[in-house]
């Protein structure tokens, strides 16, 4: 210890020499500051931010002086200073425990003498730093220096006798003042790391915001760049998030604005609406004559047609490559109506359609069609914008203070009538509809649509018991055409809802109705017997009533009540079955209905009775018509019609077929095939047929080519998998195992793709002559399909496309369908 004291004395003398010139001034300041010490300490806790700037400035000035003083003190002071800073940051163990104890004692000796001369004039905020740093430092060292407490006390007494000042902390313990926190010119270097560490004791000051110091600028070049790079993506993601948020808000707003009509009370007494306002129809654009270089020839001679005759000629020219123009009835009807539009001279000249040359006109319209396909993006956008403008202006109406979409707000342009099936009036001219042909329907208190300039409406009505907005009579069959609301509208939704609910009610009394008509087979009245047999056919075969016509239905179709003797054949036994009836007649759209069905013996006997003494073109049910049948159906159940029977039988057939065909272990494509097969059974029941598409054979060849290519791909994948497995047995390393797993997954993926293609081919082949969409959209209760999808995990998008989901699956239907495929939700069990 004597050697240590000698060494310490020499150090103290060196320190005294440096500070001797300031001694008297500091003593004076010390006496003044000691008086306010306690008060200032308390005050500094709340005013750190006010004193930080001047204290930081002093720190910077004193760092420069410390650098100069450190050069004078030499290596000895550097080691001592390094040990001092390592003590603060917890790095004391690097230089060994042996030197640490000795250096700590020397360090404390020097600090005590410095406190005597230099610590008196410290600033208030710096003294607070010092006390808190010392307190933290002591907390970290108290376990290591517990055995040396007595020695420290003795040393403190010695220094106090020499005039040293003790700095008393808030916890009541004396602690040496640390050199590293000394802002004075004491010849010690304060590193940026040490200064940075000083921020920790200020954690209790909530308002304190550490000021960046110059010594950190070296690190901040790269760091700041990284921070900027980190910030940019965040801003981007935030912007993206905002966009998504806006989209979600828009979608949510649209959902909120959607009319929840199913929650409102319905109008009574047949009232469909109380307020209706719209802008009227959009008429077809006027005819634009073809250019002069587009010639028409008759019998090899150039003929200049009048505008009206030329317009009708263009209708035929546009269809020149179609099979319709080869049909005699089409050509005959066209030529007859075309001559009505000709002038007298043209009628006298053009007497034979076969001598007319429409090739130049046809070529011109083909070029026009190609030009439309090759339009620039800007041209297409311009047309799209114009269509959108018309849609916003004419495509919506206000019904009962709600905006509703109109289905077909454009008047059909003039052209040639094609009809459904082999219609006898195909080829006739559909005349241009003018405002004078139009009947407007709207509410009295609405703004009545304005007719085009120079024209007026035929009539304006205010009939709230009908759902159409505009009507006119077309000239081909004299039928009335309408502009109606979109299928997603309230009126259409209510109509569909009522139709399916009526079919569900029929389930409750269908057995009673069946028992009734079976009893009527034995009635003494021929009228009752015919009615009972017709109802049996409607129930069992889902036949249409006959004269019951829907919009656009042609006049040459045959239904149940309009069957003639020539349409059926009776077989006592056929193909091992008794009492077989063969039906063969043109159904709706002139589609042939051909079916052989075994019937009840009583029905068979009645049919023989009905056919007695009748010619082939005589009515089979000569005592029955649709009015009599519908009246009887209404007596059996309110709202019951032949169409309700078709809806009921179609829906229950779908439900039964889904139960039989669906396998819960199948994958989604196989389940969809099962659904389509169930749908196919319904389409066959309802006779929803179609002609095979012209491109069917070509599309099947392309599909078969894809299947063959996929099979080759699967064979290659299996070979690679087998080879990888063989390598894995030899190498037995992780990389080979991963390769085997990858090849295995590739085989499974290709197998699944092949199966999808094969299912698609089967589906197409089975349904090439079956129209699945008609029954799906008009006769099948959507709740059955929705419940099936939920039960078997099939996306509803695989069953209904976007438009169908919007129009058919209204919110009311969705809300009443749960994921449980139970008897209540199955609708018809």
From Swiss-Prot:
GO terms for cellular component: chromosome; nucleolus. Residues 22-36 have a biased composition (Basic residues). It is found in: Nucleus. Keywords: Biological rhythms, DNA-binding, Isomerase, Nucleus, Topoisomerase. The keyword Nucleus applies. SMART domains: TOPEUc. The record marks 372, 420, 468, 499, 557, 588, 630, 688, 706 as: Interaction with DNA. Residues 481-482, 544-549, 641-643 are annotated as: Interaction with DNA. Monomer. Belongs to the type IB topoisomerase family. PANTHER family: DNA TOPOISOMERASE 1, DNA TOPOISOMERASE I. This is DNA topoisomerase 1. It comes from Xenopus laevis. The lineage of its organism: Eukaryota, Metazoa, Chordata, Craniata, Vertebrata.
């Amino acid at each position: 210890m004597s050697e240590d004291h000698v060494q310490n004395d020499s150090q103290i003398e060196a320190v005294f020499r440096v500070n001797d010139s300031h001694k008297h001034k500091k003593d004076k300041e010390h006496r003044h500051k000691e008086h306010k010490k306690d008060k200032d300490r308390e005050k500094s806790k709340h005013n750190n931010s006010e004193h930080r700037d001047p204290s930081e400035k002093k720190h910077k000035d004193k760092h420069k002086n410390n650098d100069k003083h450190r050069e004078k003190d030499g290596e000895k002071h550097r080691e001592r200073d390094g040990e001092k800073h390592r003590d603060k940051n917890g790095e004391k163990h690097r230089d060994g425990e042996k030197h640490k104890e000795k250096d700590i004692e020397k360090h404390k000796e020097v600090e005590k003498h410095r406190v005597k001369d230099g610590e008196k004039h410290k600033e208030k905020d710096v003294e607070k730093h010092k006390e808190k740093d010392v307190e933290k430092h002591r907390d970290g060292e108290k376990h290591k220096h517990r055995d040396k407490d007595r020695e420290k006390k003795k040393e403190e007494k010695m220094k106090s006798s020499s005039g040293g000042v003790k700095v008393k902390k808030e916890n009541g313990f004396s602690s040496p003042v640390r050199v590293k926190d000394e802002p004075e010119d004491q010849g010690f270097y304060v590193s940026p790391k040490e200064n940075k560490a000083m921020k920790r004791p200020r954690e209790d000051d909530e308002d304190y915001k550490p000021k960046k110091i110059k010594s950190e600028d070296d690190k901040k070049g790269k760091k700041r760049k990284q921070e900027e790079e980190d910030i940019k993506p965040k801003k981007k993601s935030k912007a993206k998030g905002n966009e998504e948020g806006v989209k979600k808000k828009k979608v949510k707003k649209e959902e909120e604005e959607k009319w929840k009509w199913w929650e409102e009370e319905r109008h009574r007494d047949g009232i469909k609406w109380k307020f209706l306002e719209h802008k009227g129809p959009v008429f077809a654009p006027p005819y634009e004559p073809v250019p002069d270089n587009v010639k028409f020839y008759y019998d090899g001679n150039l003929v200049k047609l009048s505008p009206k005759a030329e317009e009708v000629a263009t209708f035929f020219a546009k269809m020149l490559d179609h099979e319709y123009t080869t049909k005699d009835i089409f050509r005959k009807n066209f030529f007859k109506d075309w001559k009505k539009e000709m002038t007298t001279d043209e009628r006298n000249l053009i007497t034979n359609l076969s001598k007319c040359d429409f090739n130049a006109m046809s070529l011109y319209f083909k070029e026009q069609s190609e030009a439309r396909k090759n339009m620039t993006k800007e041209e297409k956008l311009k047309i799209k914008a114009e269509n959108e403008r018309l849609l916003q202006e004419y495509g919506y109406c206000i019904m009962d203070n709600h905006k509703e979409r109109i289905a077909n707000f454009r008047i059909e342009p003039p052209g040639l009538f094609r009809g459904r099936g082999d219609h006898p009036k195909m080829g006739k001219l559909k005349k241009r509809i003018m405002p004078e042909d139009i009947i407007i329907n709207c509410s009295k208190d609405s703004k009545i649509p304005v007719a085009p300039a120079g024209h007026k409406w035929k009539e304006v009505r205010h009939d709230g018991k009908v759902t159409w907005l505009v009507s006119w009579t077309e000239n081909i069959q004299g039928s009335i055409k309408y502009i109606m609301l979109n299928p997603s509208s309230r009126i259409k939704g209510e109509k569909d809802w009522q139709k399916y609910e009526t079919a569900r009610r029929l389930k409750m009394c269908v057995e009673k109705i069946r028992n009734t008509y079976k009893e009527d087979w034995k009635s003494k009245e021929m009228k009752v017997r015919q009615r009972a047999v017709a109802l049996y056919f409607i129930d069992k075969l889902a036949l249409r009533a006959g004269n019951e016509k829907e919009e656009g239905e042609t006049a040459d179709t045959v239904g149940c009540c309009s069957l003639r003797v020539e349409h059926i054949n009776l077989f006592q036994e056929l193909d091992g079955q008794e009492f077989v009836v063969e039906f063969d007649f043109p159904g709706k759209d002139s589609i042939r209905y051909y079916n052989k069905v075994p019937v009840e013996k009583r029905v068979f006997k009645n049919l023989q009775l009905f056919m007695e003494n009748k010619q082939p073109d005589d009515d089979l049910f000569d005592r029955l018509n649709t009015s009599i049948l519908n009246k009887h159906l209404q007596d059996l159940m309110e709202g019951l019609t032949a169409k309700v029977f078709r809806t009921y039988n179609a829906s229950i057939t779908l439900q039964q077929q889904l139960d039989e065909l669906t396998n819960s272990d199948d994958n989604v494509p196989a389940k969809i095939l099962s659904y389509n097969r169930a749908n196919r059974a319904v389409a066959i029941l309802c006779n929803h047929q179609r002609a095979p598409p012209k491109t069917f054979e070509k599309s099947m060849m392309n599909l078969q080519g894809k299947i063959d290519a996929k099979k080759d791909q699967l064979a290659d994948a299996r070979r690679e998998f087998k080879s990888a497995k063989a390598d894995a047995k030899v190498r037995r390393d992780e990389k080979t195992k991963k390769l085997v797993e990858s090849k295995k997954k590739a085989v499974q993926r290709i197998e699944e793709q092949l199966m999808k293609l094969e299912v698609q081919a089967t589906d197409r082949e089975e349904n090439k002559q079956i129209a699945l969409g008609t029954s799906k959209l008009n006769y099948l209760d959507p709740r059955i399909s929705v419940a099936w999808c939920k039960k078997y995990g099939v996306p509803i998008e695989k069953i209904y496309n976007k438009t169908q989901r919007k129009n058919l699956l209204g919110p009311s239907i969705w809300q009443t369908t749960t994921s449980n495929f139970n008897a209540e939700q199955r609708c018809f069990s």
